[in-house]
Amino acid sequence: KEDSCQLGYSQGPCLGMFKRYFYNGTSMACETFYYGGCMGNGNNFPSEKECLQTCRTVQACNLPIVRGPCRAGIELWAFDAVKGKCVRFIYGGCNGNGNQFYSQKECKEYCGIPGEADEELLR
């Protein structure tokens, strides 16, 4: 994974208040912070989606499916470890974790059972 994902967030010395996302390796989630607008480091993303797609690891597949307390009603995909497959869920838009994907294909690529796609080609 990108080395910058392992860094903590950095607001930088400037005084802007730009809402950005950084990857928190401990919680395996992308969290918000306010970026000053200059310097900082590479663990700084304009969207939660870009942050997750850059920094998430396969361990995210073992995390619980978290709707979060907000009420945005975004349809996403997550890996259900009990069912062993990717399922749809409604994400509230905040305080989620790395087990959220923007398409079934993306979820399967990260968390799918190895060889599943190959077997479909043989049928």
UniProtKB/Swiss-Prot annotation:
PROSITE patterns listed in its UniProt record: BPTI_KUNITZ_1, BPTI_KUNITZ_2
Record keywords, A-Z: Disulfide bond, Glycoprotein, Protease inhibitor, Repeat, Secreted, Serine protease inhibitor
Site label Reactive bond for chymotrypsin and elastase, positions: 15-16
Disulfide bond sites: 5-55, 14-38, 30-51, 61-111, 70-94, 86-107
Cited CDD domains: Kunitz_bikunin_2-like (cd22597)
Membrane spanning stretches: none
GO MF annotation: an example: serine-type endopeptidase inhibitor activity
Places the protein is found: Secreted
Record-annotated site: Reactive bond for trypsin: 71-72
Sequence ranges assigned to domain BPTI/Kunitz inhibitor in this UniProt record: 5-55, 61-111
Other noteworthy facts: The amino acid at position p2' (17) appears to determine the specificity of the inhibition of domain I. Inhibitors with methionine in this position interact weakly with chymotrypsin and elastase; those with leucine interact strongly.
PANTHER family in UniProt: PROTEIN AMBP
Protein purpose: This inhibitory fragment, released from native ITI after limited proteolysis with trypsin, contains two homologous domains. Whereas the second domain is a strong inhibitor of trypsin, the first domain interacts weakly with PMN-granulocytic elastase and not at all with pancreatic elastase.
UniProt-recorded name of the protein: Inter-alpha-trypsin inhibitor
